[in-house]
Amino acid sequence: MKGKDVEPMHSAIGSRKDFSNLDEDQLLAEYKACLEGILDHAQVMKLDLHTQHCNTSRLQHSVNVSYYSFLICRMFGWDYRSAARAGLLHDLYFYDWRVTKYLRSGHASWHPRVALDNAKKITELNKVEIDAIEKHMWPCTPVPPRYIESYVITFVDKACAVCEFAERKYVQIAESLMQKFRRSYAS
């Protein structure tokens, strides 16, 4: 469950965009529109009760992956709506993987299926979203992603995990890299 050191979500890691009011910024309003119907869903909000990486809640991690996947796909003209949605739902599971053991396979290859099943219960998913959620742990999952948006989520997920693990010590480095990214690519 959520540790006492987990801080409330105010923005995506490394971002200076204030998520407390998503409607005040044009880019954030566009991001929010992509997530209509799922961002405030009770099952998604429950992710805030679970720790993902060190002091990051699973909800914060999912928003991090969702937001940066949205930005990258938007920048290249890819399906940023599906990337934002799949990024938010890619870790929609409610067990502690450090405690729960699976007989079939390890957590890395099993939880994408659990997340996909849970996501299907709360919203309709398109083929890109299904692929991205199901294969976001590639190469731990045997089949590689089929769509470019799925690859974006796969790699953004890994980058966010590294930043979340290192956040306390190296937050300045992450912020510096994200500033350079924003100056170079984001509108």
Question: PLM features: residue spans?
Answer:
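Metal-dependent phosphohydrolase cores
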Residues: 1-187
